[in-house]
Amino acid sequence: AGLKYGYHNHDFEFRTVGGKPIIDRLLERIPAERLVAQFDLGWVHVGGQRPVEYLRRYKGRVPIVHFKDFVQGREDAEIGRGAVGYDAVLPAALDAGVEIIIVEQERFDKSPFESAAISLEFFRKHGLL
């Protein structure tokens, strides 16, 4: 029985202070046993960083991730249909020790059920379902 804190990012944590992204400063100052990273990989991308690199950098410290895809900046898309590059991100997430993937989409250009089915198909295509 224990409590573990996780930090869920958006894009602003990738602004730099003294030449280093805020998220890196946070994760360097708080030990991994006290704080895990719960990267929202879509926001990592929107923040100007590469999700695969962040997963590799914090391998073993990222038990949960959010998959959120974007087209044209901040416009939501189904997983695999946007600019984040989840075909490369998914294997990197699994290699980093991710145990839980939360699919997140807040705006839809079709019904939420159609969008969920499209995102689900991404995971089927990659052998996770």
Regions found by a protein language model. Give the residues of each.
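Hydrophobic, well-structured mid-protein blocks that either form specific transmembrane helices
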Residues: 1-26
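Histidine-acidic metal/acid-base catalytic patches
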Residues: 17-39, 43-129
